[in-house]
Amino acid sequence: MSRRHSAVKREVLPDPKFGDVVISRFMNVLMYDGKKSVAESIVYGALDSLKKRGGQNADPVRLFHEALDNVKPAIEVRSRRVGGATYQVPVEVRSERRQALAIRWIIESARKRGEHTMEDRLSNELLDAVNNRGAAVKKREDTHRMAEANKAFSHYRW
């Protein structure tokens, strides 16, 4: 990894339906083998079913962002070698990484669910995340619990 230049952040274009950059980024993480149209149909289908379940005045984009906010971790542990021992040091998570982790965790836990289509899995996982339950929220809680347990090593921060 080069120390001279940091990689330039690529600009992600907003999605065509809602004009939201975060939804576009979510689609890019969900996408397999460059099949963006498949990822789009899954995400839009999941957001449509969220709208149907939320009532007539439910905004699917607002629910999506609420689900993401409920999954975003505030703190995580990173390994730090001191002497011969490796310590799990709790560190605060940068905002970009928070979003990336939340997106990744929601998609991972949606893929592990038992519903028939990915659209259903994703909409149910997002609904669970809005209501502060589900596998993605549990992952965030586990991360926070791990950081809390290793609070004693927080002075090893870098």
From Swiss-Prot:
GO biological processes: translation
Keyword NADP: no
Keywords, ordered alphabetically: Ribonucleoprotein, Ribosomal protein, RNA-binding, rRNA-binding, tRNA-binding
GO cellular component annotations of the record: small ribosomal subunit
Gene3D superfamilies hit by this protein: Ribosomal protein S7 domain (1.10.455.10)
InterPro entries per record: Ribosomal_uS7, Ribosomal_uS7_bac/org-type, Ribosomal_uS7_CS, Ribosomal_uS7_dom, Ribosomal_uS7_dom_sf
GO MF terms, alphabetically ordered: rRNA binding; structural constituent of ribosome; tRNA binding
Role noted for this protein: One of the primary rRNA binding proteins, it binds directly to 16S rRNA where it nucleates assembly of the head domain of the 30S subunit. Is located at the subunit interface close to the decoding center, probably blocks exit of the E-site tRNA.
Family: Belongs to the universal ribosomal protein uS7 family.
Family annotation (NCBIfam families): rpsG_bact
Subunit-structure text: Part of the 30S ribosomal subunit. Contacts proteins S9 and S11.
Record-given protein name: Small ribosomal subunit protein uS7
Organism listed in the record: Acidiphilium cryptum (strain JF-5)
